Swiss-Prot record:
One of its GO terms (cellular component) is nucleus. It catalyses: L-seryl-[protein] + ATP = O-phospho-L-seryl-[protein] + ADP + H(+); L-threonyl-[protein] + ATP = O-phospho-L-threonyl-[protein] + ADP + H(+). Disulfide bonds: none annotated. It comes from Oryctolagus cuniculus (Rabbit). It comes from the Eukaryota. This is Casein kinase II subunit alpha. Residues 39-324 form the Protein kinase domain. Its EC number is 2.7.11.1. It is an enzyme of class 2 (transferase). Can use both ATP and GTP as phosphoryl donors. Phosphorylation by casein kinase 2 has been estimated to represent up to one quarter of the eukaryotic phosphoproteome. The gene is CSNK2A1. The active site is at D156. Heterotetramer composed of two catalytic subunits (alpha chain and/or alpha' chain) and two regulatory subunits (beta chains). The tetramer can exist as a combination of 2 alpha/2 beta, 2 alpha'/2 beta or 1 alpha/1 alpha'/2 beta subunits. Also part of a CK2-SPT16-SSRP1 complex composed of SSRP1, SUPT16H, CSNK2A1, CSNK2A2 and CSNK2B, which forms following UV irradiation. Interacts with RNPS1. Interacts with SNAI1. Interacts with PML. Interacts with CCAR2. Interacts with HIRIP3. Belongs to the protein kinase superfamily. Ser/Thr protein kinase family. CK2 subfamily. One of its GO terms (molecular function) is protein serine kinase activity.
Length: 391
């Protein structure tokens, strides 16, 4: 049997081909390190697979920042994240990388970002109105269209990576640690994204994927928001994840997809996939979520959650969907800038605009006077965890 049929993305296909090599060749990137003594940790916000995250203060200007201390991983991966953040800096709703510092003793790198006064999504999503959901989805699309136009796929779109300051209606797409440059014809690692947001292409081991992976993940977010079902596809493992998807989208279209790309399904699916009809989106509507659902919401969702990655809406096409007409009209009335996606860019100069500066820090117990990373023991300092932080 010959291998899988190749696939090329429909938009922004050759962005990196037309850029100088130094734009995408992150392995050759030379990192410019800042001064770790400029930062003082305040409290731990959470931890992820690859990092620990702290709220901190830049003591040179008393601004709040978020510091992400990277766990030991391949230097190549760290360089990739830094290069991507630098390439995207100033883009609409992209988290701004402010500084890169390193502890001289442990050599642990840390990234300093603009501070966003985030509300935990599990609390926030329960309070959002129909208009709020449209508004924030549109803001995510600005970030996605921008990064895709810059030849970059995020590969980890999920609620945890979307920071929302609801009071100021400010959104930032964060955690670019799994992001990668798109090169047509390149085969990528399918072990990316979080289970509930993994596209079918990842679950069937199709490696020639592209920006459209992010659009599937966005569709999963939209479904969870409008149907108030988090997560929408709740698989117990990666195999069960595809089964959960097939129970909604049906098995017929799944087999059409794997036939089209000549994909060989893992034999483990033989016993668990079964046969399922395609379900109508209306069946997920009930009294508790009907105020968030509209014909245009379901039409938009249907055009994102497609097995065939080539038939999903692109980010730019999505922004032109009727679901966003009211948002677009309101933003036009308010006179958004002409930036791609219609959002004011965040330059390093105005990075902290709109974020009130914090007063001179009072003594923080064991942290008073500590640099961001204690030389001998970068992760061992007793920083109080934030309430509700992911541990």
């Amino acid at each position: 049997m010959s291998g899988p049929v190749p696939s090329r993305v429909r938009v922004y296909t050759d962005v990196n081909t037309h850029r100088p090599r130094e734009y995408w060749d992150y392995e050759s990137h030379v990192v410019e390190w800042g001064n770790q003594d400029d930062y003082q940790l305040v409290r731990k916000l959470g931890r992820g697979k690859y990092s620990e995250v702290f709220e901190a203060i830049n003591i040179t200007n008393n601004e709040k920042v978020v510091v992400k201390i990277l766990k030991p991983v391949k230097k190549k991966k760290i360089k990739r994240e830094i290069k991507i953040l630098e390439n995207l800096r100033g883009g609409p709703n992209i988290i701004t990388l402010a500084d890169i510092v390193k502890d001289p003793a442990s050599r642990t790198p840390a990234l300093a970002f603009e501070h966003v006064n985030n509300t935990d999504f599990k609390q926030l999503y329960q309070t959002l109105t129909d208009y709020d959901i449209r508004f924030y989805m549109y803001e995510i699309l600005k970030a996605l269209d921008y990064c895709h136009s810059m030849g970059i796929m995020h590969r980890d779109v999920k609620p945890h990576n979307v920071m929302i300051d609801h009071e100021h209606r400010k959104l930032r797409l964060i955690d670019w640690g799994l992001a990668e440059f798109y090169h047509p014809g390149q085969e990528y690692n399918v072990r990316v994204a979080s289970r509930y947001f993994k596209g079918p292409e990842l679950l069937v081991d199709y490696q020639m994927y592209d920006y459209s992976l992010d659009m599937w993940s966005l569709g999963c977010m939209l479904a969870s928001m409008i149907f108030r079902k988090e997560p929408f596809f709740h698989g117990h493992d990666n195999y069960d994840q595809l089964v959960r998807i097939a129970k909604v989208l049906g098995t017929e279209d799944l087999y059409d997809y794997i036939d089209k790309y000549n994909i060989e399904l893992d034999p483990r699916f033989n016993d668990i996939l079964g046969r399922h009809s395609r379900k109508r989106w209306e069946r997920f509507v009930h009294s508790e979520n009907q105020h968030l659902v509209s014909p245009e919401a379901l039409d938009f969702l249907d055009k994102l959650l497609r097995y065939d990655h080539q038939s999903r809406l692109t980010a730019r096409e999505a922004m032109e969907h009727p679901y966003f007409y009211t948002v677009v009209k309101d933003q036009a009335r308010m006179g958004s800038s002409s930036m791609p996606g219609g959002s004011t860019p965040v330059s390093s100069a105005n990075m902290m605009s709109g974020i009130s500066s914090v007063p001179t820090p009072s003594p923080l117990g064991p942290l008073a006077g500590s640099p961001v990373i204690a030389a001998a023991n970068p992760l061992g300092m007793p920083v109080p965890a934030a309430a509700g932080a992911q541990q």
